[in-house]
Swiss-Prot record:
Highest taxon listed in the record's lineage: Bacteria
SUPFAM superfamilies: 5' to 3' exonuclease, C-terminal subdomain, PIN domain-like
Function of the molecule: Has flap endonuclease activity. During DNA replication, flap endonucleases cleave the 5'-overhanging flap structure that is generated by displacement synthesis when DNA polymerase encounters the 5'-end of a downstream Okazaki fragment.
UniProt xrefs under NCBIfam families: PRK09482.1 (NF007017)
Cofactor: Mg(2+); K(+)
UniProt family annotation: Belongs to the Xni family.
Record has RNA-binding as a keyword: no
Native organism: Shewanella amazonensis (strain ATCC BAA-1098 / SB2B)
Pfam family, one: 5_3_exonuc
E.C. number(s) listed in UniProt: 3.1.-.-
Start and end residues of each stretch annotated as Interaction with DNA: 185-190
CDD domains: H3TH_53EXO, PIN_53EXO
Protein name per Swiss-Prot or TrEMBL: Flap endonuclease Xni
UniProt-listed InterPro entries: 5-3_exonucl_a-hlix_arch_N, 5-3_exonuclease, 5-3_exonuclease_C_sf, DNA_polI_H3TH, FEN, HhH2, PIN-like_dom_sf, Xni
Gene that encodes it: xni
Amino acid sequence: MNRLLIIDGLNLVRRIHAALPDEGDMDTLYDRVAQACRKLLRGHQPTHCAIVWDGDAISWRKHLYEDYKKGRKPMPEALAKGLPALKTKLETLDVHSVNADSEADDIIATLACKLAATGGEAIIVSTDKGLLQLMSPHIRQWDHFAGQFFDIEAFEAKLGIERHQLLDYIALCGDSGNKIPGIPGIGPKSASELLRTYRSLANLYHSLGTLGSRQANKLREGRDMARLSYKLAKLQTELPLHLKLSDLRVNPS
């Protein structure tokens, strides 16, 4: 069975870089990133491996909603300068770079879903909880820094929803980390309670007459924001990749 290890490049590198005593020490950064990659390869024994990098183009999500990810800290200058050399060095480790035009998430999602559709296993290495919408028997998410797979049941319990309701949940209450707005006046607690009762966003909107007038009005007036938020949160899984699985093969030696 094919097993594809998909590393969220900047998610890994920026966290390692943030822990360095000297942010300009690119040699130490490379050593630590290389050490992390070797550990991931040893631990998961993939047949194929890709490290996916964010690109510089403005995301389609930003074009759709100007405030998307507004306020995010820019990449430190030293890291931005050293990143091209770091990518080149990593190629010697059987970690094959895949460069996205803008956000890496949609490329990660496409790679994972295409492999899962053939019966293979995809392991995504990232702490980005937005990727949890992809989880299935064939797709799992590994937190390198915690040294464990994400506990989906604990995540569901924390939010008070089931995994398949994640996008509907974000449509209702938004995602503050990515500046996805949600519906004004609907918070996480209300969102989880509504989904527990009505099971889906579609059912909820078909049942507005069963709600109190105040909450029904919020939902009615916020319908467009819910649609927008759902679209912003949903990962694309059918992007053209311009590569073959064999391009990502790990040297068995």
